[in-house]
Amino acid sequence: MKGAQGEAQALAYLKQQGLTLVTQNYRCRSGEIDIIMRDHQELVFVEVKYRSGQQFGSAVEFFHPHKRRKFESAIQHYMLDNKLNPSLIAHRIDIVGIDVLSNNNDKISWLKYV
C-alpha cells in the first residue's frame, strides 16, 4: 500500500474522528496538500506519511522543515485560490502517519497542530 491507498486509509480514519472532507490532492506550483478537512469551523490541512519499515524512523518523523515550508506555501496558495483570508479563517496543519508494523498491522498516528 502506498500513495493513494495510504491517503484513503487516512481519510477514512479522519472521517471516523468526525472530520468532513473538503478536497483531496490540491496541487499548485509550491507543492501538494494530500487532504483538506473541516473540523467544526476549522480547516485542517493534512499531510499523510506512509512507512513500510521503521528502520529509519516512523512515518510522522518524515515531515522535515523543507517539506513543511513547501506545505505552508501550498496552504497559502489554497487560501488565495479560494479567496480565504488566513488571518480570519481558523486553520491548522495535521499529520497522519501510517506505519506498517512487522505483523502487517497498520499503526495510525494523528498529530494535530504541528
Curated annotation (Swiss-Prot):
One of the record's GO molecular function terms: nucleic acid binding
SUPFAM superfamilies associated with the record: Restriction endonuclease-like
Top-rank lineage group of the source organism: Bacteria
Coiled-coil segments: none
Family to which this protein belongs: Belongs to the UPF0102 family.
Listed name of the protein: UPF0102 protein Patl_3694
Organism annotation: Pseudoalteromonas atlantica (strain T6c / ATCC BAA-1087)
